């Protein structure tokens, strides 16, 4: 879409908006950003890849994939096992500067391990990132509005950005705080009306998120024997065996379903496809046409998933990863949606089930 000469409004400052806003601002006559709550974000540091570099990367494909299979989050990054506050302040700051300057999720996934479990450690990394935002945004008041106050760095999924914070230094960009300053009253034919004024918009973009993890399953209206709806069974939270199948829904196999290990999504999908392929080959070899996970296995794995999340600071934060989405009716109570334990342990558990002849499942 061409935004040249247009007055554009964006509602939301989550991952989608953080990616779109810098590009829209380059074209628009004016961009108004309506922010409910700010999110932490870190530099993506994407750059063009030359032919020689691409050829070198191709020679390491197997090495890269093997590395991703060996880390807890299925990324090439692995957390530093030192405790944050045990590291001298100067060394800690240098380490964070290095991570902040590198491409990818290193600042989140390759950081000190306890930033996701220890409040003091998390406060320290949050202060570091807040300092970076203040350095990059010229107006101190705007910078302060862009710094989250309701959650620490890494306790929600961290969006990666390219020039997002610098965008707010542009003369054609306005940030509207719809929680503390200008609540949105209504959308008008001319734009957005807040409690203070009308904001003219030729184009209005809703970057308000999505119903993560279980939302796609709910929208399909999946039903089991007797017309039982999966959405109703999961009303208080999903229940699955290894995130691969819920009980009571024969032949419903899920790739990247609730309660799978979280982290590098493409690698997790790859693992799920490979595992299900093995299961289907097993069924074909034994002339089986129906598979259903055993209820006791679902209960056991669901309890494992819940316990794995208890030590994480993210379990105390409202986010789509904990099942809270106030744009969706009924999504106001936290639920454990993913396995937040070690991805390698999850992979081994799945492999053990397959190697044992899938005893956790009943076949016909």
Residue ranges, per PLM feature:
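N-terminal FAD-binding dinucleotide-binding subdomain shared by FAD-dependent oxidases/monooxygenases
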Residues: 1-5, 13, 28-364
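Aromatic pocket-lining residues of Rossmann-like dinucleotide-binding sites
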Residues: 20-24
